């Protein structure tokens, strides 16, 4: 497996001319906790699906979501990253999948559309835990309705030991198309509660040993792996982590109905480091004649 820290630098250099440009002028709002079994406004447009085609069939592979990291060099702006479970980018033999597409909402039509995803070799892994099942890439799809999750809304982004309480309400999102005659994008919300807040070692199919918490949500479909999991934390919802639908515990009756959650600190470590590298790269490029400029 490639070294993550090298991947960060390589990704920043390779993508800077395309995604300098993945900077938002305004950071998204923090999600507020509403009544039970409701999804706070502003969170449903952070999710996207990962699919591939087999003949005329569309195969659901996994789920991804967007995160916004404030730029330290350019106050008031944020870098936008697409995040998913790393194993979604690999086939059953551990090799990079080909032909992966991102499904998300078109801002003009409101319908689901498909955009090609960069190959696995362009994605960045956690610089501290290269085997953690997380991968990210700078990406701001043109003409798409997205609302990235602010870095400050990731549980444990400031305190790595922060964790939710047992029984706290959670929900996770997956992308879907609804409607027969008039198709439109919808983020499907599934609800549950925190079952095991303290992470424990668990084997994830396709990703090896991972440190996961658990939610009780009646079982999760395989394509939901990579989905953002939100937990009620006081007066707001925070990102608890990445859903892991396929673990070695799925066949254990003791853990029936539970799904794993990779803690959000792995996401925070990855995207924060990417933001630092992109900040430095953009600052250097701005000093070079003809280099990419940061939008005013």
List where the protein language model places each region.
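Positively charged n-region of N-terminal signal peptides that target proteins for export
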Residues: 1-4
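Bacterial N-terminal signal peptides
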Residues: 10-25
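Protease-domain processing segments flanking chymotrypsin-fold serine proteases, especially trypsin-like
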Residues: 26-76, 291-296
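C-terminal subregion of chymotrypsin/trypsin-like serine protease catalytic domains
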Residues: 40-43, 230-296
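Serine endopeptidase catalytic core focused on the charge-relay Asp
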Residues: 45, 52, 60-61, 69, ...
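Beta-propeller and closely related beta-sheet repeat lectin domains
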Residues: 62-63, 225-227
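A short, hydrophobic, proline-anchored segment that marks a local hinge/packing element in signaling
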Residues: 66, 228-231
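Short beta->alpha transition motifs characteristic of CBS
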Residues: 84-88, 174-176, 191, 239-249
